[in-house]
Amino acid sequence: MSAPNDNPLCTLANGQPSENPGSVQQVRYGNSNGGLIVLSDTQTLEVLAHFARERIPERSVHAKAAGAFGEFEVLEDVSDLTDANFLTGIGKKTKILTRLSTVGGEKGSSDTVRDVRGWATKFYTEEGIQDFVFNDLPVFFIRDPIKFPSMNRSHKRHPQTNVPDNTMFWDFHNGSYVYVKWHFRPDEGIKTMDADTAVRLAGLEPDYHVKDLFKAIEKGDFPSWGVYIQVMKPEEIKNAPIDIFDDTYTWPFEKYPLRLVGRLTLNKNFSKPECLATQTRIVTGILSILVEKQPANKSSVGPNYFQLPPNRPTNKVYAPYVRDGPGTMNGNYGGDPDYVFSELRPVSVSHRVQMPTHEVWAGHVTAFSTSIMDKDFEQPRKLWKIICEEKGGKEQFLHNILPTLVDIPGKLRNEVLDYFGRVDGKLKEVLREALEKQSKQAHNGK
């Protein structure tokens, strides 16, 4: 059956032709416009039921995002470090999908708010999906993973007032292998936006960065990033100047220089970034931490999120013990046994050897919460010196941070100033004097 003039025939989801997609079956009385809807009105029930379920629940963090397809190309040989297929062979290209986001804001928030930026990339390798998740900061906010939920809540709206709260922000406290730290550096360089421009755009163009990415790709101006790694051998850990497992530190570049791996380019727009499940899969040759992301993806996208096209591997998948549940798209493996080591359906396995040479740990299991030490302020002190050496850097820093300190309780403000004092004693006094000056100006203005 086809519609006149080759226009698509309007149907219900089951294919049943619709005479009028805007009509409602109802009990009519007289000439009024109202009536009682009948339960036999399949079309109305379908439309309303779908509307209430058509959106994927908003993510707890990184809710506002844009996405794009692209490719990763190997530029330098790193086969001495890994046997991961997608990283070996100069010129080898791998399809990728990237999601770029803010962190704290909800889905309707502005792109230009002062916030960390998230970066999630999915590599469609010949050996399966490889996920990477990064932030644009060289360090992470916290050491202890149990503090992760609280840290993110402190960046969100106050549960009582439902508005962002600076008090919450400041109140929260051959089988062999090597360790690497990844760096994605934009080929166009790093460009920042001053606070006044960001505030103005937040009102005039809240989707500023989403539109900028879409338009750039649409006109062929593809953004690209150089992909680098820092490398540390297991035997170097003992004498390393930092704890390499502490994400609040950077690795010294003079001791662990950047090594070029390849280039990542975004060249095709993607309209469904919420379908993208992040940091859920790794391939042989790469080790990573996946604890937090898998449950989050199962909750928001669904238990079979890995079967959605954006999350589906390009190589053949056979995992018959992962079946059933909402959103199954793979035929559910038919009558194959749903348990391992079945003689009814023998399978072959990979024989790539992983030698845990360095994976022998000596110690006692104990409940532990990290404390702040003087060593923790060494890298921030170096960063503060760099800021002071830049033209206008010190002034811009004060302009950005002072508004967040004005309206918080005095005791908490003094604690924050004490922390800045441990970075640099002069910085503490500069902040205190600036706050006192603002307080006097506000008092005189009343």
Q: Where would I find each of the regions flagged by the language model?
A:
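Active-site-adjacent core segments of small-molecule enzymes
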Residues: 1-446
